[in-house]
Structure formats: C-alpha cells, structure tokens
C-alpha cells in the first residue's frame, strides 16, 4: 500500500524523524526495487542551517550532551549533522559535552532492543546506564534525534531522580524554539 501511494503521488524524497523508519525506507524498500531518496530530519535541518534557510538563535547557555541514535549513527554513519545543529543553538561551542561512548562507539539507549516494552528483572536497565553517562558529563540538557531514544532518556531521567535537574530534547525542538 505504501508503494502504491509513493507511485500515485510521485514521491521521490522522504524525510523521517524516526531512525528506524529511515532504515526501512532507505534500505529495505530499496531491496524490493523502490527508488527513493530518504534522509533523516537531522540532515535536513543541518542543511537548512548551512544554507541559511533557517537561522536559529544561539541562546543555549547550559551545557548539553548528545545521545547518538543507533540507526542514525552506526547504521547510517551520520554523526556530523546533529552536532552541527547543536553548535548552531549554543552560545559557546564548548558547551557541547560528549559522553565517553559517542559516535561510532555510542551506547544504545535500549529501545531498539525492545527494552521499552518490558521490565528488566535483574541488573541495570540499559537506558538508566546510558542516562547516567549523560549525568556524568555535567550537562543540564540531553539531546537526541530519535523518538524512541527520547522515551528511553526521559525514563532514565525519572529513574535517576533528575526530573528537576535535566531536560531531554529532540534536536528539532531546540531549533524550532529558536527561529
């Protein structure tokens, strides 16, 4: 049904917010002969900023850390666009505080492994371990580029008692609030 609609409306390009949809549309659909240009919203936003189509104000003074979504980063190799976006909204470029495990070595939030839908009975939950890494950066804000990662980071924030101390955002929110 999707393919029929793509053909009916002559769809050539799709922009996704969800990294899992990015993978499905870009890779899986290509395997069955569907030719589409598929990009993640971080690529679009970074391109709009680079080409001065949008100009967010650099108003964030707090330190911020970025969680690389597995399906944007390791599966598609996109690490620069989200960081370029963050640099565009930070007053000081040194306010971006990387977690020790970032980019190619980033640690999964757990959503892709199904941890969002069940309760771990023993050991530390993956999203809590990842959120503790965010806490250790000293940042007051955590940004990501995946709807599932946001859910996991929000849960990690609550479990670690950081509800009042830290905020979780999608990178698009940070830009939208500043244009």
Regions found by a protein language model. Give the residues of each.
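Iron-sulfur cluster-binding electron-transfer modules in prokaryotic oxidoreductases
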Residues: 1-179
